[in-house]
Amino acid sequence: MGREFVEIFDKWVESYDASVSGQDPEYRDVFEKYDEILSAVTNKSLGAVVEFGTGTGNLTAKLLEAGHSVIGIEPNDAMRQVTAKRFPDLVLIDGDLLDFETPQKVETFVSTYVFHHLKDSEKEKALSTYASILPVGGKIVFADTVFTSEEAKQAQISKERARGFNNVADDLEREYYTTIPVLTHAFEKAGFDVQFEQMNDFVWLMDATKK
């Protein structure tokens, strides 16, 4: 249910911000235009926000600066400690994409680099849950690595192997990265209109509105 990869972030918490800022050559393309991605998610969000996978709080900061009320959902203890120290007044809950509480009305669910922790069947379940919580016009704004097709995914894995970027390739094979057609079906099945915008070679912005 998304928690099987939580321990990976115990090792990554110390260097995560260095990775997203482009200091790790292997992940530089994954996090290209990182600040622009965070801003795009923030700009498309409405009202009260639930953020999945707060990490070290980079998207949280953008959302708070934009005036949103934010509830953070984070399954990793080390990451929660970092975010809690950075934002002492933030409501921060131990939870994940499928197992969470919302103590207030929610108008937007957001996440960056998180949705791939769920299998495709779990993604459908999650979207159905969000639809049951959101009002008509409520939004899901996710940014994550997505591929146009399974063939494109395999080609990217081969490219990373050829470049010697085996950590990236292993990640693409280990976790549940999916395709735009699969996600389009899942969003529409849950009652959302969805649009996709490519942000870099890996990441697409998903902007979904409940019908």
Give the ranges of each region predicted by the language model:
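A short glycine-rich, Lys/Arg-flanked "PGG" loop and its adjoining helix->strand segment in the class I
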Residues: E124-V136
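Core SAM-dependent methyltransferase catalytic element
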Residues: A190-K211
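A conserved beta-strand element that flanks and buttresses the S-adenosyl-L-methionine
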Residues: V110
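C-terminal alpha-helical "lid/dimerization" subdomain adjacent to the S-adenosyl-L-methionine
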Residues: A143-A190, F196-E197
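Conserved class I S-adenosyl-L-methionine
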Residues: M1-K44
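Residues at the starts of beta-strands that form the adenosine-phosphate
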Residues: A48, S69, K139, D193
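Class I SAM-dependent methyltransferase SAM/SAH-binding core
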Residues: F52, T56-D99
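Short catalytic micro-motifs in class I SAM-dependent methyltransferases
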Residues: Y113-H117
